[in-house]
Amino acid sequence: MKHFIVIDGGTQNIKAFIFDEKGNEVHGEAYPVSPYFASQPDFAEQDAEAYLRITQKVTKSVVENSGVPRDELAAVAITTHRSTIVPVDEDGRPVRPAITWLDERKTEGLKLPGGAFMSLAFRLAGLSRNNPKLQELKEYQRRSKFNWLRKYEMESYKRTYMFLTTSSYIFHALTNQFKDCSSMIVGLFPIDLKGLQWHPREVVYKIFGVEREKLPPLVSPTEIAGTVSEEGARNFGVPQGLPVIIGAGDKQSELLGAGAISNDVAEISYGTAAVIELLSNKYVTHPTMDFFTWGAAIPNHWALEGFVGRGYWMVSWFKREFAKYVEEEAEKLGTQPEELLNIEMEEVPPGSMGLILQPYWHPLENDPLSKGAIIGFSGEHTRKHIYRAIVEGIAYELRRLGEIIEKHSGSRISELRVGGGGSKSDAIMQITADIFNLPTCRLHTSNLSALGAAIDAAVALKIHDNFPEAVANMVRVKETFTPREENARIYDRMFNEVYKKIYPALSPLHYRIAEITGYPKIA
């Protein structure tokens, strides 16, 4: 029996697992990481070297404690959170803290590349001065971390030999090679998402503010990218020479780990960010970025992704700000705070007695001024109503995004599969089924991103010949939650008659708030 070591690097925890070729989670461990720090408003940085040390520690511990013979270990597969930038020198050592995906800094006062050549390039690309696509490029330019480094930390930029993601940073520590996966690159990088390679046009690198040679070569998620070096074996506790696969980003890996390989089965991830994804064999985009299109964990496919930036991060926020008593009570009972919150939540009826939440604690990608909102308060509402409204609000938003994906892809979602921490709760699974009015499945493991990376490794090594075979052998539905008719009826009305009208009603006020308070800054 072959086994795969999987490194799953999250925002709040780093996990390592051993999966076998049947998809069984033989052993797994999770170590917490220090949260990001913010030296200025909108910043979100992390100590990359500390992150790597914890990654090495948890991987070594899992291999030692798994009981799996070392000669049965077939490969190491990596999947991590996305859009974090780790600037490193020629030896792979960070030259400054990592800039995480939660970072919202912008660089003002930039101009798009000028000159006759650039004007011609824009015209050839069909980008007139007022073209929406050109405005989108300007926003990418403002938000590019490369441009920020060039303007405010030019010495750090000059010292950077390679800009890595969290995955490629870990890969280098394992193999002493610079490579990344085309399906790991999302967000503010100069990538051609249709071709799944670095962009062929030089003007794009000028807009993002980075030289092509500072970006690593890209491989597919089923390519053996390298082998474990002597130093990597010593630091990670894995056999030297073992093949290493850089899998897709964590969310695309979850889509594969859920076995959602047809265009009528969507996957929901209830993690720090909440996401709904659907696999597509064609490149489909949304004109105003209501959903994203990234390379999928299956080569030459794409993941259509609706994204709630601070999804189940909001549960941590709620516990910290409003429910410290729950943590104390959970410790006394020897359980998790979330379990107690979920029990309390079930005492609240569907619709939270009229309390409804818009979960934009992280602004929409196409509206940086958008804000979160809770409306409908009365004297009857308590903390448990707010908690249920958070869970319902995230699901409402994912349904809204799912409907947009259906419309633009021509697909029709008939089933949901759910991963992430939220999938462990029966109450959350049932609320999801009721709000979407769709059968909603829990898989045999909640660690779907790690399982997806293991599936990529199994296909890369030809242990399974193709993805349908791998999914059939490695993914199992454990439980299906069927919508409750009365609850679904209430939620359908709340979604269509109330939730979908909140953002259009509040959007003008978001602008006024920013204008009056100066936060966030209006471009």
Segments predicted by a language model, with ranges:
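Glycine/Thr-rich phosphate-binding loops that ligate phosphate moieties of nucleotide
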Residues: M1-A30, F37, A74-L112, E155, ...
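Short acidic, glycine/proline-rich loop/turn micro-motifs
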Residues: F37-F43
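Glycine-rich phosphate-binding/catalytic subdomain of phosphoryl-transfer
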Residues: D42, K57-K332, G518-I522
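A ubiquitous short alpha-helical element
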Residues: F43-Q46, R442
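Phosphate/oxyanion-binding active-site loops and adjacent basic polyanion-contact surfaces
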Residues: A48-T55, V391
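Active-site-adjacent loop/helix segments that line or gate small-molecule/cofactor pockets in enzymes
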Residues: A48-Y51, K251, G271, I502, ...
